[in-house]
Amino acid sequence: MPTTLSSSSGRAAGANDRVQIGFIGFGLIGHQHVHDFKNQPDVDIVALSDCYEPRMRQGVAMCGPQAKGYSDFRRLLDDKNVQAVVVSTPDHWHALITILACQAGKDVYVEKPMTLFVREGRWMANAANRYHRVIQVGTQQRSGIHYQHAKKLMRNGYIGHIHTVRLASFRNIMPGFGRPADCAPPPGMNYDMWLGPAPKRPYNPHRSLYHFRWFWDYSGGQMTNLGDHELDILHWVMGVEGPGAASSDGGRLALTDDNGETPDTQDALFEYPGFTALWSHREASRGRGAGAGLEFFGTKGSLFITRSGFQVFPDTKIPPQNQVPQFSGMPVGGPTHVADFTPEPWTPAMKIERSNDLLAAHARNFLDCVKSRREPIAPVEGGHRVATTSHLANISLRLGRKIKWNPATETIEGDPEASSWLERPYRAPWDRELR
């Protein structure tokens, strides 16, 4: 996406204009977004769509008396009063709704993970460019002031040359959510619309209304859900577009008494030029709290960061020969310890607390870019590259082998079977929307 976008294909917002927002999807994060945008001083919430009528009514009530409710998001996109949309649907709808919104002349704030499969990301970026639309991806950590501070420090060499990054999310949801039987959809739910481009399946309470993340038809599991937040910061700080290789292992190893499919345990190793990154998630063990956020390891120490803040842990300057173990002296010719030296840190220690509401700041950045036509802080191209990285890990896990990736050509090298996983078919009639 270019730095500044033309506004020729849609109604431009002047510097003092209000922005008319429509919401598509009113689940957990959709509720949060209505709250955040409603509290912005220059927003009019004019519409909300959800294919589950009770949620649609609840969302419209939260939006206010001026908001219209739509059970079909396409009617919201037809509404000329809607200038921009916030997409908070399950993952399998993100790309198609975003592309159709761009075609309708709407700017888009779309939740992460941006895509369900790799090729969707390029389709979305192409739509943004073709229709001159602003797309903000919901990787809100970029809008945290302490994340921006940490990025600046690391870019300026505060912890030295970064060679390793660890990323993680650990929690314990044992014994899981059970195995409800297939049944009829709840009253007021258009299940066929909820499925949209996804395969036709019998309704199950776990296939919708939050639990969709445990099924490959609609999500990449916690690798794409939580992993995208942390990988996004890694890409942003390190200035990379993707790994050269990804390998992953894990599975549904602990939550075996429910009907979920995606891994409760997963490790993924990403090989980038000059450094490696390791993602780990656990759904059945929090342990000592080691599984959270990111830690960047450099030659002067490490920087650990979460949404609560960050801390620099400096290494101590110790002569290398003093780090060789000795047992009652060293044999002749071996390293000799330096007897007279003063240990000192390679870099100053630092601890910074969170200082702003990053979700509200992310909404604010999107609105400012709708008006200015500038590229937002979390643009579509970056969202595509991050989601691709997570998808590569899942392809590796499901095929049981390392995936070699060329970020420049966006192709998997030397593996036709893995390459076939870069795209999934859309169910009719939604498959015709992109033709």
Give the label of every model feature segment.
Residues 31, 95, 228:
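Residues forming the Rossmann-fold NAD(P)(H) cofactor-binding site
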Residues 148-149, 161, 166-221, 225-381, ...:
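Contiguous beta-strand/loop segments that form the cofactor/metal-binding neighborhood of enzyme cores
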Residues 2-63, 141-144, 234:
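N-terminal Rossmann-like dinucleotide-binding module
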Residues 42, 81, 158-161, 242:
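Glycine-centered tight turns that cap/initiate beta-strands
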Residues 90-91, 95-143, 157:
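Beta-strand-loop-alpha-helix segment that lines the small-molecule cofactor/substrate pocket
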Residues 67-72:
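Conserved SAM-binding strand-loop segment of SAM-dependent methyltransferases
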Residues 17-19, 133, 163:
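Nucleotide donor/acceptor-binding cores
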Residues 84-86:
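N-terminal Rossmann-like NAD(P) cofactor-binding module of classical short-chain dehydrogenase/reductase
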